Amino acid sequence: MSSLSVYHVSSPDMPNKVLTHLEDIASTLAEHGVAFDRWEAATPITPGASQEEVISAYRTQIDTLMTERGYVTVDVISLNSDHPQKAELRARFLEEHRHGEDEVRFFVAGRGLFTLHIDDYVYAVLCEKNDLISVPAGTRHWFDMGENPHFVAIRLFNNPEGWVANFTGEDIAGRFPRLED
């Protein structure tokens, strides 16, 4: 089940609130310009599936998002626990960073913890299959796929170069809960 845990930056061990209803999660995130919605990921996809397989299976949803929101590039991150670079990828995504464009992810299998650092609060969004999250450009965040990743997410970009991160150099991500496998 998707959830949102909200922490004050000074209290990484105790969330101020935990939300599990879509409407509550979406409205809380919307206060900060973050869109959270459910889309149907009806085509079965196994983590580790190729980018081509995933894009082909979800071409209709991808085209809709690209047309409605002006995205120009799409890619897929598809990882399972057998991936040879899982530790390196996890370490890179766990560093707080921001992007010069919106970050959009449609989870079509598995789950991941997308954590946002906004002002004095940290919003940990557990995203699962069917979740669509859109984080505004410039928002500090990190992503945890767990020690044994099991997820597939379609990523959409305004930038033709795709995923370009600007790391903040802050160590805040290490102080907050991570995805439990």
Curated annotation (Swiss-Prot):
Highest taxon of source: Bacteria
Residues annotated as signal peptide: none
Pathway: Amino-acid biosynthesis; L-methionine biosynthesis via salvage pathway; L-methionine from S-methyl-5-thio-alpha-D-ribose 1-phosphate: step 5/6
Sites where the protein binds Fe(2+): H97, H99, E103, H141
Gene of this entry: mtnD
Residues the record marks as site: May play a role in metal incorporation in vivo: E96
Organism: Pseudomonas syringae pv. syringae (strain B728a)
InterPro entries membership: ARD, ARD_bac, RmlC-like_jellyroll, RmlC_Cupin_sf
Enzyme class, UniProt record, top EC level: oxidoreductase
Site entry: May play a role in transmitting local conformational changes: D102
Residue positions binding Ni(2+): H97, H99, E103, H141
Cofactor note: Binds 1 Fe(2+) cation per monomer. Binds 1 nickel ion per monomer.
Protein name: Acireductone dioxygenase
